[in-house]
Regions:
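Short catalytic-loop micro-motif centered on adjacent basic/acidic residues
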Residues: 50-55, 79-81
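Hydrophobic h-region of N-terminal signal peptides that target proteins for export
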Residues: 11-21
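Helical hinge/lid and interdomain linker segments adjacent to catalytic or ligand-binding clefts
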Residues: 44-49, 57-60, 64-65, 69
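Generic anion/oxyanion-binding catalytic loop in active/binding sites
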Residues: 11, 52, 151
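Sec-dependent signal peptide recognition
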Residues: 2-10
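Acidic-and-aromatic substrate-binding clefts and catalytic sites of carbohydrate-active enzymes
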Residues: 55-62, 85-89
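HKD-type phospholipase D/PLD-like phosphodiesterase module
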Residues: 19-45, 69-179
Length: 179
């Protein structure tokens, strides 16, 4: 019985300790707007291999420049944009980023609403870096979101969250239409 208890305690510590190394941060805007934008740019800027993005509205030039620089360094970037918010938006980064080497862009609408001629939207604000970090929250990637809005941004390297985000991204990517 004593050996069983020792094994039980050791297993409990090991299972509990698996998540201890995870780095997570949450930012509330507008109070932490600069820290939030820096966290997003730094996370994207740390990419060595891949960046996967699903974004409703993306007009922020600072963030676009970070992606441009990573693509120039060979990072493969896939961006899913919401169709309605970006297709005819002259401020969207889709045309600029879609023209760059190592960046592929596509458009996604939400699901069709029953028998009606209406589609939902792709309302994600998600980035996955190297399959190791995930960033998500309420903020569109716009200047306004990071300067004036009440938004939230969450950054994590927790493996279970990253894997779940990658799976969701993969499902959206399969339905995405070329720009």
């Amino acid at each position: 019985m004593r050996d069983f208890m020792r094994i039980f305690v050791v297993m409990g510590v090991l299972v509990w300790g698996v998540g201890l190394g995870a780095k997570e941060a949450v930012y509330f805007m507008p109070q932490e707007q600069k820290a939030a934008l820096n966290a997003l740019k730094n996370t994207l800027g740390s990419a060595k291999k891949t960046i996967h993005i699903a974004i409703y509205n993306f007009t922020n030039k600072e963030i676009a420049k970070v992606l441009r620089d990573r693509a120039r360094n060979g990072v493969q970037i896939h961006i899913i944009y919401d169709r309605e918010s970006n297709l005819k938006n002259p401020h969207s980064t889709i045309g600029y980023l879609g023209a760059l080497r190592n960046i592929s862009v596509c458009l996604l609408s939400g699901k069709k609403a029953g028998q009606k001629n209406y589609f939902g939207i792709m309302h994600q604000k998600l980035a996955i870096v190297d399959g190791e970090q995930v960033v998500f929250g309420s903020a569109n990637w716009s200047k306004n979101a990071f300067e004036n809005n009440y938004e939230i941004l969450f950054v994590s390297d927790k493996k279970a969250l990253v894997e779940k985000a990658e799976n969701a991204f993969g499902e959206m990517l399969r339905d995405c239409k070329a720009y």
